[in-house]
Curated annotation (Swiss-Prot):
Keyword Manganese in record: no
Role description: Repressor involved in the biosynthesis of the osmoprotectant glycine betaine. It represses transcription of the choline transporter BetT and the genes of BetAB involved in the synthesis of glycine betaine.
HTH tetR-type domain span: 8-68
Keywords: DNA-binding, Repressor, Transcription, Transcription regulation
DNA-binding region: 31-50
Any GO BP: negative regulation of DNA-templated transcription
GO MF term (any one): DNA-binding transcription factor activity
Name used for this protein in its record: HTH-type transcriptional regulator BetI
Alphabetized InterPro entries for the sequence: BetI_C (IPR039538), DNA-bd_HTH_TetR-type_CS (IPR023772), Homeodomain-like_sf (IPR009057), HTH-type_TetR-like_transc_reg (IPR050109), HTH_TetR (IPR001647), Tet_transcr_reg_TetR-rel_C_sf (IPR036271), Tscrpt_rep_BetI (IPR017757)
Record lineage: Bacteria, Pseudomonadati, Pseudomonadota, Alphaproteobacteria, Hyphomicrobiales
Origin: domain of life: Bacteria
Recorded metabolic or biological pathway in which this protein acts: Amine and polyamine biosynthesis; betaine biosynthesis via choline pathway [regulation]
Length: 198
């Protein structure tokens, strides 16, 4: 039997191991045994805590979303103006915790498998709605609601696109460049200038 009080630690170790294993393989075609081995625990213990691979995968996604939400809430509390709020949202999406090579690969894998999994698709839609609503809340203090929605849609697509680009690249993720690209896009849109250079 698992030791009393060890469950939260073991669950977190298994979730972290799932991120690494999925990220390394670039696929959800992993087994509980492989994840358990990566975590240094027995497959039986992994099954005890999660009940199977599908539940472990969903728990991993929920964990990433919870971490993102927690970090975002903390960053937004420090923002005193709309521009600061926008900067905080962008920065958190490219933070070291989220924009690490294995985490990026895991996110990309989740997007691919959302086509076959309603549960994964639902979680990704929740993420997209939260990102959009957070951006719109700040942007509509600087422009019309219709324009805020359009800019937020573009910024969200850009963030997703940068994750995909870095997942396919061999170089280490460059968070500073990614943040600058999204911030520049939003600044250009708010200024009313065309998004492409003449």
């Amino acid at each position: 039997m698992p030791k009393i009080g060890m469950e939260p630690l073991r669950r977190r170790e298994l979730i972290d191991a799932a991120i690494r294993t999925i990220g390394q393989r670039g696929s959800l075609d992993v087994t509980v045994a492989q994840i358990a081995h990566e975590a240094g625990v027995s497959p039986a213990l992994a099954h005890h805590y999660f009940g199977g691979k599908d539940k472990l995968i969903l728990a991993t996604m929920r964990h990433l979303l919870r971490e993102l939400g927690r970090d975002l809430n903390a960053a937004i509390k420090q923002a005193n103006a709309p521009h600061e709020r926008i900067a905080a949202i962008i920065a958190v999406n490219f933070s070291a915790a989220q924009f690490a090579q294995e985490t990026i690969a895991a996110w990309l894998t989740f997007y691919v498998h959302a086509q076959q999994s309603d549960d994964i698709k639902r979680l990704l839609r929740i993420y997209a709605r939260r990102l959009h609503s957070n951006l719109v809340f700040a942007l509509e203090q600087l422009t019309s609601r219709a324009r805020a929605n359009r800019i937020a849609e573009g910024a969200g697509a850009m963030i997703d696109g940068l994750y995909i680009r870095h997942a396919l690249g061999a170089d280490a993720p460059d968070a500073a460049s990614a943040i600058a690209l999204v911030e520049d896009y939003i600044a250009i849109q708010l200024s009313g200038q065309p998004s492409a250079e003449n």
